[in-house]
């Protein structure tokens, strides 16, 4: 247990620049890759021609990712289990297996999965420091070309703790989704 605490302090010092050095995106990736379980409550706003807002509860465990819709009330209780290359939608004891869209991480069901995967495994095209809603933050930009579309994610994490704060999702420079993290427990 002591080794784990020391490792976390070292990773966070690298993330937060305890020595006054610039933030290292590799330290951020190391922190997220080392997380064994995560719970995130988030607000997701989708703008793909019509505006839609969702409140979700996301949980990552060794078995996979799980998302439950909290809001709007008309969809509350719908759950999705997300595994590599597939998902299962569950409601009121019934389940339906489904495929994820070709551009993974760009729909509300797998937005948090994609955000965490980029933070853990991605190499940001750009990163820098800025303030976000009163928090000293690090912004990381991840870009991929998918199916002839440029997919970009901007992800802000709190500088001192590494806690995710916000993400914006762009397809061909048009913002299609935002994720605001309300609670993060690792």
Predicted regions mapped to residue ranges:
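Sec-dependent bacterial lipoprotein signal peptides
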Residues: 1-17
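N-terminal leader/targeting segments and the immediate start of mature chains
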Residues: 12-64, 74, 185
